[in-house]
Each structure stands twice: as C-alpha cells, then as structure tokens.
C-alpha cells in the first residue's frame, strides 16, 4: 500500500517536477490506510480451505521475495499509472495544483482498490467481497466522504493545496481508476495461475 506513496514522493523530486504529495497529504493517507487495512483484513473471514493448507515452515521468512513480490508489482504499477497520468495532465496544460488534485484523488481511491485486490476471500468480484466483509463497503463510504468533505470545504481544500477537478480532471481520475483495476486484476490472475 505504501509503494505508490513512496514513488509519488521520490520520482517528482528526482525529476524536478512540481511536488505531488505534501506532508499533509501523507499524514492523511496514513490516517486512512492503516485503519482501513487493519479493519478490513481483520474482519475478513478465513479462507474456506485454511485448515487444509500445510503449515508454514518455521524457517520461512515473512520477508521472502515471494511474499513481497505481489505487493511490489501492484504498488509499482499503480504508481507508474499515476505518474503517467500526472505527466499527461501537465502536457495537456493542467496547473500543478489541478494535477496534484487528480493524482491525490486517484491515489486514495487506488488504495481502496489495492485493499479489495488483496482480500483473501471471494476475490472474483467486488460485490462478493463486500457481502463477505461489510467493513469494505463502510471503509469505501467513509473514505469517499472524507474526500468530498476536503474538496467541498474551501478551508480544508486550501490546507491540502487541492482544487476541485474540472471535467478533464474527472475524466483523468476515472481513466486512472479503470486502468488501476485492470492492472490489479491482471496481477491477481497471474499470481493465481502461478500458485495453482
């Protein structure tokens, strides 16, 4: 979940682009991501075949490449999409604040997609995942409410250095989310085939 945040901080700095994520954005993202992950994954029911799985070896490291690879691939893919989206917006004449707003909104919603993509149970469709774990829908509603509140209230919007996206910005957010969902679904399908 943190890979896109790291990339969106480092890459603009290294390439001398306008800043995409300010400290206040990172604080808000941490306040959203950590509780969301804890609540959703802790409330997730155990997999149906959990007791049929062989136990993990005592010598197996939780930091083995096999365990980290999926998260790295997912996060780097989302980060690349957001960086390309930012570059496209800049080329289309969007202001740095407008580009930042689109990237921030898409990042927050992409984190929700990452949570959905990594659920252990009923991963074939969002509706099934929501029915198996009602906390996912609640987290989505709460996160969307926070985003709307930030964009609707000028003091919060100014604090976050964001702006309400125009038509081009909304289209960009929608396209980035669709591409992120395609990427995450593809990674999940490839991993399922490899593990089969």
PLM features: what roles do these ranges have?
Residues 1-122:
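Membrane-embedded transport module
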Residues 25-27, 51-71, 124-141, 160-168, ...:
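Membrane-interface segments at loop-to-transmembrane junctions
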Residues 76, 112, 145, 154, ...:
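Hydrophobic, well-ordered secondary-structure elements that form the walls
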Residues 89-95, 124-126, 155-163:
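Membrane-interface helix termini and inter-helical loops of multi-pass transporters
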Residues 104-107, 164-181:
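Small-residue-rich transmembrane alpha-helices that serve as helix-helix interface/gating elements
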Residues 112-116, 179-189:
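Alpha-helical transmembrane segments
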Residues 119-123, 185-196:
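Membrane-interface capping segments at transmembrane-helix boundaries
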């Amino acid at each position: 979940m943190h890979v896109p945040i790291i990339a969106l901080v480092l890459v603009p700095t290294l390439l001398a682009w306008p800043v995409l994520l300010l400290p206040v954005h990172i604080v808000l993202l941490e306040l959203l991501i950590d509780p969301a992950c804890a609540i959703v994954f802790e409330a997730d029911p155990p997999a149906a075949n959990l007791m049929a799985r062989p136990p993990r070896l005592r010598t197996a490291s939780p930091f083995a490449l096999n365990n980290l690879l999926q998260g790295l691939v997912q996060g780097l893919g989302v980060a690349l999409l957001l960086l390309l989206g930012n570059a496209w917006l800049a080329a289309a004449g969007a202001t740095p604040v407008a580009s930042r707003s689109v990237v921030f909104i898409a990042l927050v919603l992409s984190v929700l997609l990452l949570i959905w993509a990594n659920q252990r149970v009923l991963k074939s469709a969002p509706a099934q995942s929501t029915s198996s774990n009602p906390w996912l829908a609640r987290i989505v509603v709460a996160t969307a409410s926070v985003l709307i509140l930030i964009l609707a209230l000028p003091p919060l919007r100014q604090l976050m250095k964001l702006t309400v996206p125009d038509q081009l910005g909304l289209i960009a957010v929608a396209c980035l989310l669709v591409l992120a969902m395609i990427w995450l679904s593809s990674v999940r399908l490839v991993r399922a085939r490899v593990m089969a």
